[in-house]
C-alpha cells in the first residue's frame, strides 16, 4: 500500500472526494481516518507503470481545489528497485521512499520473505 496522509484540518468530504477522483487506472483507493488524521490509502496495481510518484501527483493536482493539504507519505511494504528507479531520486524523501524501501535492498541485507 501507499498512503498519503492529509493535514489535520482536511475534511472527511475532501478526503473522500480525493479518493474517488484518484481511483482508477492502476490505483485502488480508500479514505481512512486514523486518529485525528485522514489518509488516502492506495493499492498500486502495477507500480512499474503507475508508481507512488504518479499516485502522489494525482492527489497533489487536486488538493488546491479541495481545501486540503498533504502532510506526508508512506510506503507500506516494499517496492521493486526497478519501480523506484523510474522516480527521480530528488523526489524520494517527499514521497517517503528510498533505496532501503526496495525488495532487493532488504534481500541483500539478510531479510527473508
Model-derived features: positions:
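Long, contiguous binding/interaction regions
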Residues: 1-113
Amino acid at each position: 500500500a501507499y498512503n498519503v496522509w492529509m493535514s489535520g484540518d482536511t475534511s472527511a468530504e475532501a478526503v473522500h472526494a480525493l479518493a474517488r477522483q484518484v481511483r482508477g487506472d492502476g490505483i485502488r483507493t480508500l479514505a481512512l481516518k486514523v486518529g485525528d488524521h485522514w489518509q488516502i490509502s492506495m493499492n498500486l496495481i502495477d507500480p512499474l507503470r503507475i508508481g507512488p510518484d504518479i499516485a502522489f501527483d494525482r492527489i497533489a493536482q487536486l488538493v488546491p481545489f479541495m481545501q486540503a493539504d498533504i502532510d506526508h507519505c508512506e510506503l507500506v511494504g516494499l517496492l521493486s528497485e526497478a519501480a523506484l528507479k523510474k522516480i527521480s531520486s530528488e523526489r524520494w524523501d517527499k514521497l517517503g521512499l528510498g533505496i532501503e524501501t526496495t525488495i532487493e535492498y532488504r534481500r541483500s541485507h539478510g531479510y527473508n520473505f
